[in-house]
Each structure stands twice: as C-alpha cells, then as structure tokens.
Design a protein with these regions (language model features):
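Domain-level recognition of nuclease-like catalytic cores that cleave nucleotide substrates
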Residues: 146-206
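Conserved catalytic cores of phosphodiester-cleaving nucleases, focusing on short active-site segments
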Residues: 101-103, 110-124
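A short acidic, amphipathic alpha-helical/loop segment
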Residues: 123-127, 149-150
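N-terminal active-site wall of soluble small-molecule enzyme domains
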Residues: 95-105
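Acidic-basic catalytic patches of nuclease active cores, encompassing PD-(D/E)XK
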Residues: 41-93
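Hydrophobic beta-strand segments of well-ordered beta-sheets in folded domains
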Residues: 112, 131-138, 158-163
Length: 209
C-alpha cells in the first residue's frame, strides 16, 4: 500500500503528464475571413474568401499581421501570375519551413514568400533561394533591437524586403480578430486601411530594406 506521500507524488506526476499531453494536443483555431480589397495604388479590386489557422502559440496580433501582409501583396496575384496563381496562408508557426503567406504560380513556382515577426537570418536566406521575392513584416516593440543585430547579415539578399509595421497599429489590428470576419482593405499611397465596418486601423509601414 502506498504511503500518503507516495500517493500524492504519483497524483502530481499523473497530473503533469496529463497536462503536458493536453497542451501538445491543442489544435489550431480556425478563423474565416471575407476580405474585400481595394488596392488603388495597383488598380486591384477583389474579394478573397480566406481561412486562417491560428496555432496555439500564435497571438491574434501576429495572425492579423499575416492577414495585413496578404492584403498588401494581393495585387501580385494579377501582376505576377496574371490571375493564374494561388495566394494563400502557409502553415506558419506549425512548420518553420513553410511561409506565413505565399504566392504560387500555376507551375508550382513560388513567386512570393512572406514572413512575419523576427526570424533568424538562415531561414530568411533559405526563403530567398526558394522564391522570386521575400517580404518580411516585423511588428513587435523589440523590432529595432532585432534589426540592429541582423541587418548586416541580410544585406546581400537582393530578393528581400523588410518592413516595419508600427506596434500601435499591430496591437489595434488584434482587436479586429473574430472567428468570422467581414473586412474591408483599402490600399492607397502605400498605406493600408483595414476595417470591419465599426473600427478601422491605419497601417503605415516603414521600409527598412
């Protein structure tokens, strides 16, 4: 017969194992978006029915930055692929080898690879070898520190563009997140206005590279 102390230790161990398994088994949360894009800068107007899978470790802020990045670059579906391509979200945090957003032409070639956040230089270099163009959107308060530490390592990557989304704007984007969203995106003079009919967020990204 187990002593009271041994029984309690076994109970704690069982609880820890169960909690760990439950955490590992957490599934991505699915978000549905109807995104109406009016890109005045590039004369691109289209509705996109999108599905976002938010990884358990991904914040609403990061997820909405992915959505904003797609809106900024949706016109390339027409300009780069003549409408015959696939603009879609990748596995994101579920697979570090997969882009957050990508544009693939009808041959399966990656025309555009988009990452958000503050990745290391090696994954960025790999992305530049896999796609014609790579766009990186950073948004956190620590972005300036990250950029100072990585800028010189990215200088040689001609296919790469790096954009800084103001943190206040990215935080405001998070408040638009709903499991089902009807959003309007207007792009003019390089800026994005994203709204749901009640609230609108203005995004004026700054190009760092």
């Amino acid at each position: 017969m187990l002593s009271a102390g041994a029984a309690w230790q076994r109970k704690l161990a069982t609880f820890w194992i169960t909690t760990t398994i439950d955490t590992m088994a957490l599934k991505s949360t699915i978000f549905k978006v109807n995104l109406q894009i009016a890109d005045i800068d590039h004369n691109y107007y289209a509705d996109h029915a999108l599905t976002l899978a938010r990884h358990p470790s991904e914040t609403d802020e990061r997820m909405m930055i992915r959505l904003a990045a797609l809106a900024f670059n949706a016109y390339k579906l027409q300009s780069e692929c003549n409408g015959d391509g696939v603009l879609a979200f990748g596995a994101g945090l579920s697979d570090v080898e997969d882009p957050d957003v990508s544009l693939t032409d009808f041959t399966g070639h990656k025309r555009l690879w988009i990452e958000v956040g503050q990745p290391e230089d090696k994954p960025i270099s790999k992305a530049c070898n896999k796609a014609d163009a790579v766009m990186l959107y950073c948004f956190a308060h620590s972005s300036e520190i990250w950029w100072k530490g990585i800028e010189t390592k990215l200088t040689r990557l001609d296919r790469l563009q790096v954009w800084r989304v103001p943190t206040l704007a990215s935080q405001a984007l998070a408040k638009l997140a709903q499991r089902s969203m009807q959003l309007q995106a207007t792009i003019q003079e390089g800026n994005l206005m994203l709204g749901d009919g009640k609230d609108t967020v203005d995004i004026e990204p700054i190009r760092w590279k």
